[in-house]
Amino acid sequence: MKLATAKALTAAEVQQVLDYTAKHNYAQRNKLMFLMTVAAGLRVGEVACLTIGDVRNEDGTVRGEVFLAADRVKHGHARTVYINTRLQAELAEYINERKWLDGTQPLFYTHRGPRRAFSPNTLAQHFHYVYKRAGIKQGSSHSGRKTFLTSLASQGISVFVLASLAGHKSITTTQKYVTVNADMNRRAVELV
């Protein structure tokens, strides 16, 4: 699905997805993979390549800033992803409940075991399946990231900050991710 047709989720739809994931196998993993897109703005391919060592400090705490090397991101531009404190706490709980062998293990692994990471394509298909089963029409692998950027834009965050968070070199690219809605327009005119 192209970005132009990807849907930015409403708060109610985000909750629908969270409710759906809570009722099914691998609930915590699936919830966190989803939250990494809607609360941290990661691309699905970036979620797929995360390792324990990417997010966990040596003392066992979860980083607030995750560095993604150029060879692991789209267009080969390294970037730092910021993880809010709520998501850090959820990730810490997820990591601490498992017996991790080392920092090279995938953060999110398939049903085949802790050494089997999702491929970006398989994870994109997984998101499509979850959205469909949760009753979200037009949900795609881009929906979480588009939701993240649209949500921040609706709170008045500068397009320059959005571009930085998204790892975009051009604000023109970032603008394609933001879905302007009637509520945003209403709030804007009230500022005058």
Model-derived regions: residue spans:
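Short alpha-helical segment immediately N-terminal to, or the first helix within
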Residues: M36-T37, S151-L152, L165
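Active-site-proximal segment of tyrosine recombinases
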Residues: E46-A48, G139, L149, I157-H168
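Basic, Lys/Arg- and aromatic-enriched nucleic-acid-binding interface segment
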Residues: A11-A40, V44
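Helix-turn-helix DNA-binding elements, focusing on the entry/boundary residues of the two helices
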Residues: M33, V44, K146, V159, ...
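Catalytic phosphate/metal-binding cores of nucleic-acid and nucleotide-processing enzymes, i.e., regions
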Residues: L3, V38, L50, P114-R115, ...
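Catalytic-site neighborhood detector that most strongly recognizes the C-terminal catalytic loop/helix
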Residues: L68-R72, A166-L191
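Conserved tyrosine-mediated DNA breakage-rejoining catalytic core shared by Y-recombinases
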Residues: C49-A78, Y82, L87
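C-terminal catalytic core of Y-nucleophile DNA break-rejoin enzymes
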Residues: A4-T5, V73-A92, Q105-H128
